[in-house]
Amino acid sequence: MVEHTRKGRLVVLVGPSAVGKSTVVRCVRERLPELVFSVSATTRAPRPGEVDGRDYRFVTRAEFDAMIEAGELLEWAEIHGGLQRSGTPAAPVREALAAGKNVLLEVDLEGARSVRKVMPEARLVFLAPPSWDELVARLTARGTETPEVIARRLETARIELAACDEFDNVIVNDEVTSACEQLVSLFVSTNSR
């Protein structure tokens, strides 16, 4: 008898700064403990409570450049006008998918576009704020960015929101539990396809 291994499914989550991606992802990971969450490499500094290797792989610009040069990233991008870089190490994603595991990537708009080019089977999901005013309030309430950084992040958010028709699904994060359940249901329905 020949045993067929099911290839895992890749879901790519995108949303503007302060839309609540990390909170929703945390909820999804609690609901789907078998889900593989790709840890992005980033040149930005850790926020309070973030752990290197769990939330992100925090690297210097020189280390990030070396990863690009070695072809180790599935996607990468300059974010917020070059303020930082972020990317997805390719090997862990490809290995998990080949082993039949479902993978969740949390990336920016350009990252999602890059993943779609190299992995067209990926399901792209956009996490949207309930309103522009709510997004602005969430971003300023974090208290972790300067006014200049907030302005750059809001400009990036306008571009991201304008591109939401490029996504397979749009989930409005007006309430974390509801957004989490919608994302979980996409994984469950993706599994049955």
UniProtKB/Swiss-Prot annotation:
This is Guanylate kinase. PROSITE patterns: GUANYLATE_KINASE_1, GUANYLATE_KINASE_2. Residues 8-188 form the Guanylate kinase-like domain. The lineage of its organism: Bacteria, Bacillati, Actinomycetota, Actinomycetes, Mycobacteriales. Its main location: cytoplasm. It comes from the Bacteria. It is an enzyme of class 2 (transferase). It comes from Nocardia farcinica (strain IFM 10152). Essential for recycling GMP and indirectly, cGMP.
